[in-house]
A protein has these predicted regions:
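ATP-dependent small-molecule kinase catalytic core of the GHMP/sugar-kinase superfamily
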Residues: 127-155
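Active-site nucleophile and cofactor-binding loops and adjacent substrate-binding regions
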Residues: 102-103
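Stable alpha-helical structural segments in soluble proteins, enriched in small hydrophobic residues
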Residues: 106-118, 135
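Histidine/cysteine- and/or acidic
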Residues: 107, 111, 122-130
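ATP-binding N-lobe of GHMP and related small-molecule kinases
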Residues: 1-99, 113-123
Length: 155
């Protein structure tokens, strides 16, 4: 662990061709491919810092469902990378949440990118896309930005 804070940003995206169904619910893996366009001016920015206590904390107000989803995601990626450190999370969108603009996609992509930077994991974009997908299927596309085609595969 070489950093004590990391900030990352990711764009929302809009699917031009949506995926249908899931090949794996556990890994949030789509059954079919998809094509999207990154909405580069609509972004989520997330900052992660080491928490001082034994729980993750948020600067941002989240409803219970969103909080549980984010905490479950963090627990899973911490376990996958054998990291015990608890985090303080600050996250904000520069666009309205819950309006169909894929804020969960940009949110989980930004969270994945910040986690990678904080713990100096140096994951390849394709691996970061798989990590982000655990939080939101569309986040796999937001990791890349721009025009993205994701092809359904075994992983």
């Amino acid at each position: 662990m070489s950093n004590s804070t990391a900030t990352a940003s990711a764009a929302a995206n809009i699917a031009l061709v949506k995926y249908w169904g899931k090949a794996s619910v556990e890994n949030n893996q789509p059954a079919t491919g998809s094509l999207s366009l990154g909405l580069e001016d609509l972004r989520t920015t997330t900052t992660l810092e080491y928490a001082t206590g034994d729980q993750d904390t948020f600067d941002t107000e989240l409803d219970d469902k969103a909080r549980r989803r984010a905490l479950g995601f963090l627990d899973r990626i911490r376990q996958n990378h054998q990291i015990a450190q608890r985090l303080h999370i600050t996250t904000a969108n520069n666009f309205p949440t819950g309006t169909g603009l894929a804020s969960s996609a940009s949110g989980f992509a930004a969270l994945s990118l910040a986690f990678d930077a904080l713990f100096d994991l140096r994951l390849a974009r394709s691996d970061l896309s798989r990590v982000a997908r655990l939080g939101s299927g569309s986040a796999a596309r937001s990791v890349y930005g721009g025009v993205v085609e994701l092809i359904s595969s075994e992983d």
